[in-house]
Amino acid sequence: MATTKSFLILIVMILATTSSTFASLEEMVTVLSIDGGGIKGIIPGTILEFLEGQLQKMDNNADARLADYFDVIGGTSTGGLLTAMITTPNENNRPFAAANEIVPFYFEHGPHIFNSSTGQFFGPKYDGKYLMQVLQEKLGETRVHQALTEVAISSFDIKTNKPVIFTKSNLAKSPELDAKMYDICYSAAAAPTYFPPHYFATNTINGDKYEFNLVDGAVATVADPALLSVSVATRRAQEDPAFASIRSLNYKKMLLLSLGTGTTSEFDKTHTAEETAKWGALQWMLVIQQMTEAASSYMTDYYLSTVFQDLHSQNNYLRVQENALTGTTTKADDASEANMELLAQVGENLLKKPVSKDNPETYEEALKRFAKLLSDRKKLRANKASY
């Protein structure tokens, strides 16, 4: 009798724990963040293709898209372009691009976007005309409010000297931010010295003209927009019941996937104090943006990994980054076919690498684990909605 009673107690405990786990997963807020990096967007593009493929297999649904699983998708520079590609609706109100179309997009359009023959000696390296043309062609007249999930795309206004963050949740208070997606994507990609800044105008809530003079959001030290994307999610928690579980910065209730575009540790791409002691403004100008982007990405990852670890939720945060780019793969604008092939291979090889020295789990295994959580959470929410 005592044995039977103990067995029943054990069953109840297991069921209670399982129920609690499901409830916890259902409450999770999911965030995807994609770094800037020009043509190196091929690397996160490869990772996104793998992740979406896993979700399609798990849910037995070839039409499954990343926007169906993430509450917030954020990006800077080329990451902003990827964000738009996987969240902007087509005529069927589905993302106009599947993840497996991202890398082919770079191969088709990259050589024309980064065409050195269009550059000017006393001006931006590229005129940006083809980039704008292809953005208008792909994104049409869609605006921020039409995105299929919350987005966070960053840029920097050189007239007001302030960052500009385009999100759906800001539109009620700031309707002037409901810009066309092609204007936003060009602005996010308009890195100083590479592309001209972008001017466009919208209307305020009173109907007044509102002007933007924008460059790449990485200028606002958000080359890694993960923290920005998390901030958008936590701000929504104050108003949206679907985000309520992360009020008071409860990162235990958040799943965060952050995709990098690669960094380098090559000696000839870094510098010593002795070497730079006599540098002037021109020499510093050529490398300062790269340095600040690398520093901001490192600090963002350091902060987030520390916070998640302190909350014993380190498995809720995954940073996918290649830290050993070499040769031409370090360049944001080398769109030669040979280099793009190398970047695609970097992405494929990255899947087989361990997450860190302390974590032997490969990125492929970690992404499969993430995909399972995303899939289960979506099913739990769908079941709840059906009642």
UniProtKB/Swiss-Prot annotation:
EC number(s) given by UniProt: 3.1.1.-
PNPLA domain boundaries: 32-230
Domain of life: Eukaryota
Residues with attached carbohydrate: 115
Hydrolase is among the record's keywords: yes
Motif GXGXXG: chain residues: 36-41
Pfam families according to UniProt: Patatin
Active site positions, chain numbering: 77 (nucleophile), 216 (proton acceptor)
Motif (GXSXG): 75-79
Annotated GO biological process: defense response; lipid catabolic process
Alphabetical UniProt keywords: Coiled coil, Glycoprotein, Hydrolase, Lipid degradation, Lipid metabolism, Plant defense, Signal, Storage protein, Vacuole
An annotated Gene Ontology molecular function: monoacylglycerol lipase activity
Tissue: Tuber and stolon.
UniProt feature coiled coil, ranges: 361-385
Enzyme class, UniProt record, top EC level: hydrolase
Signal sequence residues: 1-23
GO CC term (a single one): vacuole
Domain notes for this protein: The nitrogen atoms of the two glycine residues in the GGXR motif define the oxyanion hole, and stabilize the oxyanion that forms during the nucleophilic attack by the catalytic serine during substrate cleavage.
Primary role: Probable lipolytic acyl hydrolase (LAH), an activity which is thought to be involved in the response of tubers to pathogens.
Note: Patatin have a dual role as a somatic storage protein and as an enzyme involved in host resistance.
Protein name according to UniProt: Patatin group A-2
The organism of origin for this protein: Solanum tuberosum
